[in-house]
Amino acid sequence: LMIYQFIYSLLNQAILLPITADTQDTALTIFSTLNDRGLPLSDADIFKAKIYNHLEGKDKEIFIERWKELDEQATAANESIQQLFYYYMFYLRALEKDTKSTTPGVRKYYSSNKFARLYQSELLDNLFVMIELWKVINKGEVLEDESWSSNIKIKQTLDTLTSYPNEFWKYPVIIYYICYRKDKNFEDKFARFLNKLLAELMTKYILIPTINAVKGDILKLNSAIVVSDIPKFDFKELDQAQLEAGIQNPHRNVVRMLLKTLAYKHQDSLLPSKWEIEHIFPQKWQTNYFIDESDNKIREKIEHIGNKLPFEKKLNIIAGNGYFAKKKKEYAASKIEITKVMGLSEIQEWNLESISKRDIRISDSIIAILKKWNKEYSVITKEIVSNKPSDEDLARIAEFKEKGWI
């Protein structure tokens, strides 16, 4: 009965109002305005319509099929077409040497110059290329004929970068991959580049924990990448003397990066997908445990890096807020090497002095890792420079050309 009432109402009470528009832009504007209470058009929807109407004949059918495949692959890689266009904007800005700190809106950026950037023949191909990268980062997939995707050290560095507090790490990684993925020595150079990027970003955030601290540096790096596969990291100099203290008592947003960096030094596998930051000395303690120390000092010390471990969520729930001797059994069962070693150690008591000693060990270890990465990157930079002809060599080449010898 209800269905007949609906049909009657639709035929006799609904009003069909035709709306015509002189251009597609006008039609899209009208649709967005009338549809504000429904599901609004995304930038990707508008870009799809623009590209489709720019094509002719069978190219339209091919485009629709490729767009559908792009959407499916992006979703499977935990990304979206909307996000891919945003990432790609930074690649195009790098090609255009645009290092302005103000990030334009995606729709505004692509709509400039009559949507010319959308009509570039390589657009869809490069969006598919980006998805390949995210398949590795987000899903842990191994790509056919791309050996770097099974390189555990590269995957560990990428995993550590995913814990960076904002998305600025993504843009140079994407640009580097698009530009050089087919090069002969890509795997080695990509590994060193990623380590160098992580070293710069982590160091900067430890000392200046704000989003804008690296924005300008990253934009300059993006432009440098499209010119060279050994780009110069023109990051501002930092006070290295403050780094040790910053590692020992880090901002909460950088703790996961530090723990991953430390953990990956000691194992050749990724951390489990679900792990938590474990406080060795519990956040809730008995007030009579430290009679001579103020609660504020204890609370501050508990948050030091020396009191923290990466720990599987299930084991962490079992360990609870128990004291060290009681939690060692769960630590020993961990598949995270540095946590397991702590559980198998002969240490029976954990106190503020223990935290201070481990603070020093961890900061020394992290600083050593950062120095190693910087040195490895500088080595390939020097190799490139040493392989270039000197002024004397160039003069000889010019002389030989003039004489017709070459």
What are the residue ranges of the model-derived segments?
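Flexible coil/loop and intrinsically disordered segments
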Residues: 1-406
